[in-house]
Regions:
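Short functional hotspots at interaction and active-site rims
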Residues: 1-183
Length: 183
């Protein structure tokens, strides 16, 4: 059966409230001091990037498991309905919850996942190959431009910073189109 597929890359990420210090320019002989939050808190995102348009969609699950992955896929499908006559080719890594998601939807073909099955064909990346998933670059750039070398006094401040960064990429844009296309 011949069908038209739209490529979509998916992955999850945590952003920690702890300050991450990276290289920077400092006056010779000076030692920079960087504040750091005294706790271990994080905010989590499940992201989908469409290289054809450069659009980024994110959901905010509390934790990562097959149920939250399925919820995230459904949220993506509501926000980005599949065009008539097409399906999404959803590229995922080998996280255990991704394997279970794919098994339940495609292999066991459970009826409660028919809505996803008719819209999505899954593609599994080879093990240990984050370099083949361009959404990893989205996470890297977001950290580099928004969270590295920055002190966040609260988790809500970190979340609003990351949300604002992702909002810029929610509409079609050339930056993600270029970043997420293999040439």
């Amino acid at each position: 059966r011949s069908e038209s597929l739209i490529l979509v890359y998916q992955d999850e990420v945590h952003f920690q409230i702890q300050t991450t210090v990276t290289a920077g320019w400092y006056k010779k002989g000076s030692a920079p001091t960087v504040k750091s939050f005294p706790g271990r808190f994080k905010t989590s995102y499940s992201g989908f990037v469409i290289p054809e348009t450069g659009e980024l969609f994110t959901a905010k699950p509390e934790k990562f498991n097959y149920e939250t992955t399925i919820d995230s896929i459904r949220s993506f499908l509501v926000a980005h309905p599949v065009p008539e006559g097409k399906r999404y080719a959803l590229v995922m890594d080998n996280a255990p919850w991704h394997k279970k998601t794919m098994r339940l939807i495609e292999v066991e073909a459970l009826p409660e996942y028919e809505d996803i099955r008719k819209c999505v064909a899954f593609i599994k990346l080879p093990p240990y190959s984050p370099d083949l998933n361009p959404i990893e670059q989205v996470w890297r750039i977001t950290r580099r431009e928004n969270t590295h070398n920055v002190f966040f006094s609260s988790l809500s401040l970190l979340e609003s910073t990351v949300d604002s960064a992702f909002e810029v990429w929610a509409s079609p844009n050339d930056q993600l189109r270029s970043l997420c296309t293999f040439k």
